Design a protein with these regions (language model features):
Chain A
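Short helix-loop capping/hinge segments that flank enzyme active sites or metal/cofactor-binding pockets
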Residues: 44-50, 54, 129-152, 312-324, ...
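An N-terminal boundary/leader segment
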Residues: 1-115, 325, 345, 349-352, ...
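N-terminal, positively charged, Ser/Thr/Ala/Gly-biased leader segments
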Residues: 74, 91-154
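Acyltransferase
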Residues: 77-81, 111, 332-359, 383-393, ...
Length: 543, 543
């Protein structure tokens, strides 16, 4: 047996001990008390750790409303920060959603902002995210913190530079206070790894919290954060947004700075690029984030941004929305069909929205190429990272078949690019010919599924392949009436049938969130967010 | 000896006859009369083909001023179109600058626009390029016209679709009337090919018209067009702009729609992408073009655009300009040094511009990689195209060594990408640390050189590699005082010395234009154009 400089188990044990030490004793909950519960959403307010003001701050506002309160001086930045640190600590103890905890640094910065504010009352006016605690997926670098991405070989190597976005968010006035869990390889639908373990879904702990930005999903669902940032190369913002019943925006590539995010791909891998975006409890918070970022000089922070500015576009008063009921390879499960129907019917009742049924072409071929784009040189680089500390692949890496992807050649790579250029033309034409403002469709063929069963990203990956922005809007939750139906309803062959069988009815899936995604034109993120806010206002009666 | 379906010579002969037939008899000049002259700039107004109004229309305005006259109804669109068709015909007979001639279609469209205008006087208000004749590099597809790019194998295959930009320009009100010459392979500094032959430089016919957009360069220098469109992957807009003493803008990749431009690269080749941009007799015409394009919905025309809108940015009143005197591998020739000094001194006299001397890092390594990016799979695809009709490579293809580029692997390609990402960070830092708005530097180490001697693009290619926008501003012309100096002044070794020796003094180089290029931040095309217009107003006393 090979000898490792250090075995992953001891690295993980030490890392977990250190992480635990970052939670003040007074904030510890009796986790055993909640061991039997599957739905943990109420625990933060019932566990007795938060005082009345902290419950108020963390429970009753979205980031937009909270920002207003901070500007009005209702609460100091320190009060707000402490409240969210506490609630994040509770969320973590319930779901294992955090990787790096730096509450002390955050509270110290909050105090400084409060001091500055006393000396110059105008200083906050200029900073659109002033005083707002923002959580980040572990892959973003924050000075002094590890960026292990759950790989043992990267533990205890604190960053000496911020990711471009972390630097920008600080300049915009935000408070960074924690980073969140993700899958080994950052490629699966289960936020599980050998260093930090698995993040649980607070709606139903028997189900996955989703991935790869699953830590954010669980943290935000429990309101341990109101605004977090994920990345999405095949669905990694949208899948956990669906699983955890929150809003999420996959921005177009480069619109939100992405440089300095740890990416496990071979350096220089191009083709389909990961994109960053916000996850939140309201869609207007996603807008707050996107507007703040797109109004700033992102190009000074990151040499790889796409400089699409926020334009304060007029909101359209009449919308045409393409409706895609299924993607032609994976049949949506009964709750997903019900959720999409519900959203469609609500939109149809509006005089301002016209629904246009659509079919998406070439999904199977596109998804095959997307999977190859994920690892054009094969997956040896992952094995090499695992082998440094002897860690095994997590189960969900096997579920998606990642380690069996073989590399292609330069010619094969360009052939994929050429096919993608053709697909891009076809899809633009589909949008233009139908004069649609957006497409509405499922985020996946199913809700959150039991652990380690999330097998593909055919509903989400298409939009990464084409680089169209996409927004997840929660619609409902699985309830008593969502019965399983017969597998004969699976229309697309044996693999589809296997996936379809996963849904066994409301007993196992109780409270699993149901969502839709809304997709807009490439780089038209602002227009899409406007459209999605309009749709959300009808579906969920918000803003 | 191999038998070809058809030999390139017969294809070229037939194509040239057809082209010649597109010029009305009344517009033919006695070309022999000008066989001895090297400077042809005055011939269009002295040859007797243009009447007084046509001379006025084509000689005394830039496109911006002419557009105003058209809107005022001083001249009909037909009058303007006929005048430019005539003058383009003259320019072509002098320099062989045109490939496809479609004057009839253009004049027919002009009549239609005039008719529409009579019926609805407001129709022109909405179209920013209303009634303006615009010429296109041959590689842009125009319905009904060949897109041979000077390759015999592509002759007699008329396009059934417009390039995205051609479609957009028509929708913006422009008149398309001709396409222009370029080098075989679209990769050299000499616009020469086996189908159409060589374009001459109207300033000095002993020198190259530059490439690859050399036909536009010659045509615009002779005012056979006021506004043309080129493409630039290593300098192909800027080199002919320098050689022909005109303005040219290499936009950032994707800002000006580029889809449907014939690209001889293997389909799907990515890495360094070609960018389109305007060439004109004034910089404000380049702005007119860029503003019109960037204000339109380019993303509806082209699935590959980068949606950076025109923002009507405030023009900065104080500028910091980085001055790069040479690029560290090729020593500028005496006229280039004089031109840059002249521009620098003029700018320094302004209270509003601060000059910051700069050195550019890593040019040699960057240029090596750029050259590999031009043909990552090697150059067999060119040979294959040549072989279809038995045509040989043109001399300038040998000069640049294109056919000896060997392919790389997918891993090698990603390694190049990774080096480029690092270079991009370094260069952004150079710009930001020095707080510069732009860099000013030579366009090449030399002016236009004798035929088939243009050997590299080390001054221009850098900005394609990094995707920074760049503007060419003419500064002066070679005159009596521009003596050659000793080769000891060549600082960078034998290859530099060979290049340096090319400049033999004002006898051979008489009237060769001298220019500078001004480079701005990636995708900040609008801000760069503002900066360049300001610099131009000081250097050339224009707007």
């Amino acid at each position: 047996m090979r000898e490792y400089a250090k075995d992953y188990r001891s690295i993980a044990a030490e890392k977990q001990r250190q992480r635990q030490s970052k939670i003040p004793k007074d904030w510890l909950i009796d986790a055993q008390k909640y061991g039997e519960a599957t739905n943990l959403l109420q625990v933060p307010v019932t566990c007795g750790i938060l005082d009345g003001v902290e419950r108020e701050i963390t429970s009753n506002y979205d980031a937009t409303a909270l920002s207003e309160k901070i500007r009005q001086g209702v609460w100091s930045v320190e009060q707000v920060t402490v409240a969210f640190c506490k609630r994040a600590a509770i969320a973590h103890q319930l779901t294992n959603c955090l990787t790096e905890i730096f509450f002390d640094e955050a509270i110290e910065r909050a105090r400084q902002l409060d001091l500055e504010q006393r000396e110059d009352p105008n200083c906050k006016a200029l900073r659109p995210l002033y005083g707002l605690p923002i959580s980040l997926k572990d892959s973003f670098q924050v000075v002094g913190q590890d960026t292990s991405t759950g790989l043992a070989c990267f533990v205890k190597k604190p960053a000496d530079q911020n990711s471009a976005l972390a630097a920008l968010l600080l300049d915009l006035g935000a408070i960074l206070y924690c980073k969140t869990n993700l899958p080994q390889t950052i490629m699966t639908g289960d936020s599980d790894n050998n260093v930090f373990g698995r993040t649980l879904n607070p709606h139903n702990t028997a189900l996955t919290a989703g991935g790869s930005t699953g830590g954010e999903g669980a943290l935000i669902a429990l309101r341990g954060s109101l605004l977090g940032v994920g990345t999405d190369i095949a669905g990694s913002i949208r899948i956990p947004s669906l699983c955890n019943g929150i809003y999420g925006v996959r921005g177009s590539v480069g619109v939100v700075p992405h440089s300095g995010v740890r990416d496990l791909a071979v350096p220089g891998t191009d083709g389909v690029r990961s994109a960053a975006g916000p996850m939140a409890t309201s869609l207007r918070d996603c807008r707050l984030f996107m507007k703040a970022v797109m109004e700033s000089e992102t190009w000074r922070y990151d040499s790889a941004v796409v400089s699409v500015p926020w334009r304060n576009l007029q909101v359209k008063e009449k919308l045409r929305v393409g409706l895609v009921e299924d993607n032609g390879i994976h049949t949506p499960s009964p709750p997903i069909r019900r959720g999409l129907n519900k959203a469609t019917q609500l939109l149809q009742r509006s005089n301002d929205i016209e629904i246009v049924p659509l079919k998406l072409p070439s999904i199977k071929e596109i998804y095959q190429d997307l999977f190859q784009y994920m690892a054009p040189l094969g997956t040896e680089h992952y094995s090499e990272l695992f082998n440094r500390t002897g860690e095994p692949a997590i189960p969900s890496v096997d579920t998606i078949g990642l380690m069996s992807v073989e590399g292609t050649t330069l010619r094969g790579f360009f052939e994929m690019n050429a096919r993608r250029e053709e697909a891009a033309k076809k899809y633009l034409q589909l949008f233009c010919d139908n004069r649609i403002d957006a497409i509405m469709m499922p985020v996946a063929a199913h809700t959150a599924v039991p652990w380690d069963r999330w097998a593909n990203a055919t509903y989400t990956g298409l939009w990464n392949y084409l680089d169209y922005p996409a927004v997840v809007i929660p619609v409902d939750k699985v309830g008593e009436t969502d019965l399983a139906d017969d597998v004969v309803h699976a229309k697309y062959g044996p693999e589809d049938a296997n996936l379809y069988r996963l849904y066994t009815g409301p007993e196992l899936y109780r409270d699993a969130p149901i969502a839709v995604q809304v997709i807009g034109y490439r780089q038209m993120d602002e227009a899409l967010i406007n459209t999605a806010i309009f749709a959300d206002s009808i579906i969920n009666g918000k803003e």
